[in-house]
Amino acid sequence: MLTFDNSPTVYWLLGYLLAGIVILASVYQKLPGKAFLVLCIGLLAFMRMPAIVFNRELNADESQMLSHAITLYQDPVYWRSVDGTTIGPLDNYLLVIPKIFGFQIDYTSGRVMGLLCCIGALLFVFSAMKKWFGESTARVAFTAPVIFLAFTQENDFVHYSSEQLPVFLLTATIWLLSRITDSKQISSFITFFLGLAAGMMPFAKLQSVPQAMVVVLAALWLCYQFYNRTRENKPLIFLLIGGLTFPALLFLWIFANNIFQDFVDFYILGNAIYAGGSSFTEIPSQFYKLVLLSYDFSVYSLALLIPIIFGLIQTFRPSTTTRKAADFLVPTTVILLILTGIYSSTKSGNSFIHYLNFCIYPWILLAAYGIKSRSKWFIAAPLILLFWFAGNDALSYRREHRLNAFESVNGLNKLDRSPVVVALTEFTKPGDYMVVWGWQCKYYVEAQLAQGTAENHSERSIFKHPMQEKYLGRYLSDLKRTKPAVILDAVGIYSLWVQDKKTQGIDNFPAVADYVHQHYTLVSTIDDVTLYVRKDRLITQQVTVLPILATTSH
């Protein structure tokens, strides 16, 4: 299998050479548009390959969603077997697709799916810009996000994140909106699929809803204007039908599987608690701090700053001539997408850089609007980005002889098996469930075992909040339902967020602790993780393990 060391010099030089060709091709109009797009997507895939073959966790969310996918392949009923908290079911079902085709669910397969979403989003945005601003503007503007996404090595933009699918769906709705913006005859077929894609977004990630609403409102306005002109209401009706189709089918499935109460309690009410983060007045400062956490996104934003300012000036500048609908609707929609993207990135109050995925494409849309009459000058933006990445790589090469942040030699292109997972495999077999108390979801991925509780971490069962008892009750109910072969108490130095064994370990929660001690035997403690094995599994496998309170630690 393909591997990369820390300094694949020739590979990197080829990447920069291809990037230069892409930038030149963006202004060389004689090159066919399809050939230009092939070059751009080829560059993105080429430079993303080191991160894809690096088969290790880059972000805890990756392991969380991959664990969900492993579980859904075994028990495909979301909200019964899996609860992704703010992450919707579609994000997790997407990761099951490689398994259906015979591939392992791991970090490599997850990043391939993320890359496909990224490619799709780019193509949709290019098509929308081409429709709204013309091909010459679209080609020049398109190179900026391509260069950014191809050369960034910041983990939050290369790992599979819960924003990639909703952003893909969002850009699909933007492209469909562009198809009806200036049309004398609005296609009901297009409005149906626009509504369908928008209706799916709340079930990919709840934070994407504000941006979905912006596009739907724009489409509603166009359909209403069309109705006023023609008295034809089919596009409007089909938009509404499309928007209701996926939620209606989902609710039928929810009722068929008797999980409506779980949906209400844990997807609606549970996430309402999570949404109580930043207030409106705190959002600007929160967003500023978030952007500063990502040097690459900061440079991306600065490179687009002047075109964005031009776009704002053009939007609010008084016009002496009568504007077409597109002259009003397009910039208004894009500005609202920017504002809702900022809101979605900050409302939770958490400074997670991958939330900035909601802002990448609205940024470039407003920049493209700003330079549509002087598009060739915009070549400065991708050049600034390319020089930024080249400068960083040159400094890194000089200081550490390193170009690649995702070294995959020495077995790093294969799924790891940590000492904890090696120990638990003595007591498990394919098809078993396992449970991790605390937050260390990578153990599920390494063991390739389904999670025995709907949440694969216990953060919402541990921390104080109004629904803590409900989460604890479901946790215990899930343990009784799935009867996991092993339980890990991972609260400790290697756990995310929950590290205090004295107050957060499993023994601090009597109902759960009583069940564990009644049905499980403490086998060992490895890397500050306590391993419990189901008693009947010990007997079945004829393994003699005495209950111990203090055991070896590796």
PLM feature segments, named:
Residues 112-134, 147, 172:
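Transmembrane-helix motifs of polytopic, lipid-linked glycan transferases
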Residues 210, 342-378:
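Hydrophobic/aromatic-rich transmembrane helices and adjacent perimembrane loops
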Residues 211-245, 314-320, 365:
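Perimembrane helix-loop-helix junctions
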Residues 18-28, 123, 295-327, 335-339, ...:
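Hydrophobic, aromatic-rich transmembrane alpha-helices
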Residues 54-68, 78-97, 101-108, 258-259, ...:
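Extracytoplasmic catalytic/substrate-binding loops of multi-pass membrane glycan-assembly enzymes
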Residues 85, 213, 217, 301, ...:
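Short periplasmic/luminal acceptor-recognition loop of GT-C membrane glycosyltransferases, typified by
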Residues 131-133, 171-193, 223-227, 303, ...:
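Membrane-interface transmembrane helices that cradle and orient dolichyl/undecaprenyl
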Residues 188-206, 212-217, 245, 338-346:
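Membrane-interface alpha helices of multi-pass inner-membrane proteins
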